[in-house]
Amino acid sequence: MKKIYTILLITLILNPANILVAEDTPIIVISAGKTLQSIDTVGSTIEVIDSEAINNSSYSMLGEVINEFSTSNNFFQTGGSGGNTAIQLRGLEKRYSTVYLDGVKMMDPSSPDGSFYLDNLTKNGIERVEILKGTQSSLYGSNAIGGTINIFTKKGEIGKHSDIEVETSSENTKNINYSFHGANKKFNYFIGLNKYLTDGISQMNDNDEKDMYRNDNIIGNFGYEVNDNFSIENSLRFADTFYEYDTVLKSRTDDGVSTDNIEFSNSLKLIHKKDNFKNTLSYNKLQIERYTTDYLGAKQNYFGHRDAFNYLGEYNLSLDNKIVYGVESELDASRM
């Protein structure tokens, strides 16, 4: 099944009271095209979870971190680590809350309603999360009635750095993070590697059978400044996960039901700035593969991918006064 969407966007953002903006004014990304706006002028309820809060959280999975620091949301998770995890905004169904990762629309074309679940997103390599509550349809499309969750990965900092972190806990759980990053005047990079492994617990009562979960993932973020006016940015994420779970049959306790997922997202941006103009041409890709095994040993495969081409132009009078225009074309496809 294939679907093609084309969207034209023309927006005028004017806030006369903020023609002059102090250098320390907090800014927030309010669209997948990364249009900057000071947080005080955002016309929606918004919550920002910064890198300090994410790093200090005792949770390893990003969905649980969001639930810890965000309010007035419906959070649900089926079973332990690896179980379906989602956040509902404004009390609406999950499909009415869109998720973006570095500008990539994370909607699974192979799922019945296109929903994307957060169960395979770990917190490693995540710089911040911005949650816009309330309808965002004009910026994000018709699915963003409840709101939008924008997730941004880390970028390299000046110099050369490396970090390693090892965590262990009950149920033979291990969480290993390693990252290296750096930057100079022309180039910046961040690469984060993560392995999460646990024996898990059973979703069913009255048995001690384990439902294991494994997550191997990598996050990469790269930027290169060709000259004073032109730069290139590329971010990617790859995750290979395996999850065992129980059927609804009470007579079965260790039935070998499992799902093996592969998720890949990539965003490539060409950015040109001159005077008050900024033009961004981007290509975003999402690919999801799911391999399921039922209690009889029968296997079923699901494939979904999304390709999007975006052009975003800005004429900036100031931080909060600008004209934004652009066009977007998407191709969704799925098969079994």
Task: Report residues per predicted region.
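Non-catalytic regulatory/gating segments with a bias toward low-complexity or hydrophobic composition
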Residues: 54, 66, 129-130, 149-151, ...
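Membrane-embedded beta-strand positions in outer-membrane beta-barrel channels/transporters
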Residues: 86, 128, 148, 161-165, ...
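Short acidic/polar hinge/loop motifs at secondary-structure boundaries
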Residues: 105-133
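Extracytoplasmic beta-strand/coil segments of soluble accessory domains associated
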Residues: 63, 67-105, 127
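N-terminal periplasmic "start-of-domain" segments of outer-membrane beta-barrel proteins
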Residues: 27-57, 86
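Outer-membrane beta-barrel pore domains and translocons
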Residues: 33, 134, 152, 165-171, ...
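Outer-membrane beta-barrel domain signature, strongest for Gram-negative TonB-dependent receptors
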Residues: 213-332
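Periplasmic-side early beta-strands and strand-to-turn transitions of outer-membrane beta-barrels
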Residues: 138, 150, 157-159, 167, ...
